[in-house]
């Protein structure tokens, strides 16, 4: 992808957040095969009975290619009763920051893709929050680290197809198909009413908005 050359440099060292899903496993393989210097970080929240299999998938890939891999296992008892996603996000970025300090890098690469952008725009519209940037930025500062997202121009299916075409093992998180959280509801319910033409119009409108 052209965004790799635009956003990533061979001489830099990157923290790569990998969940074990097709998005991050595809990005992991792309960066590894291209020769980028990467340190893999995986967070196991132990919220699903099969979450250890996600961890094993990430560890197996890293072992195969002799890549440094760090895992943060979190006791689910630390979660408060409300807003798990925000709590998980803070814990995840704290982990990235700790590993980044160990290796003297503040650059974190994540596998957000165009489907995530579309979901973000829809959620912003639902909240009437359209004054700032719509969607997801390729580069942003989050909790003390610089986050780089080189996959925003491609759809999730592209990353899934990449895994199939390159024999990259990945895991599907069944909770992504539920509707408990707002993002999951938007993905699995709201966007079912959006055809490709409507999605393209939405993306074009957001792009024009962000260029003002």
Q: Each predicted region: which residue ranges?
A:
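Core alpha/beta nucleotide-donor-binding catalytic domains of modification enzymes
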Residues: 1-188
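ATP/NTP-dependent adenylation/nucleotidyl-transfer catalytic domains that generate, transfer
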Residues: 181-212
């Amino acid at each position: 992808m052209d965004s790799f050359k635009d956003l990533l440099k061979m001489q830099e060292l990157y923290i790569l957040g990998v969940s074990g899903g097709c998005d991050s496993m595809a990005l992991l393989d792309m960066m590894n095969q291209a020769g980028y210097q990467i340190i893999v970080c995986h967070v196991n929240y132990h919220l699903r009975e099969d979450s250890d299999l996600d961890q094993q998938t990430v560890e197996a890939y890293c072992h195969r290619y002799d890549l440094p891999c760090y895992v943060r296992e979190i006791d689910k008892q630390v979660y408060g009763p409300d807003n798990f996603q925000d709590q998980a996000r803070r814990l995840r970025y704290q982990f990235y920051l700790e590993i980044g300090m160990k290796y003297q890098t503040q650059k974190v690469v994540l596998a957000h893709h165009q489907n995530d952008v579309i979901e973000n725009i829809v959620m912003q519209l639902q909240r009437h929050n359209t004054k700032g940037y719509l969607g997801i930025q390729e580069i942003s500062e989050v909790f003390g680290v610089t986050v780089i997202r080189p996959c925003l121009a491609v759809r999730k299916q592209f990353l899934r197809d990449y895994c199939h075409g390159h024999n990259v093992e990945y895991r599907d998180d069944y909770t992504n198909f539920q509707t408990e959280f707002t993002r999951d509801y938007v993905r699995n319910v709201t966007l079912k009413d959006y055809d490709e033409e409507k999605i393209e119009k939405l993306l074009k409108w957001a792009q024009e908005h962000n260029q003002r």
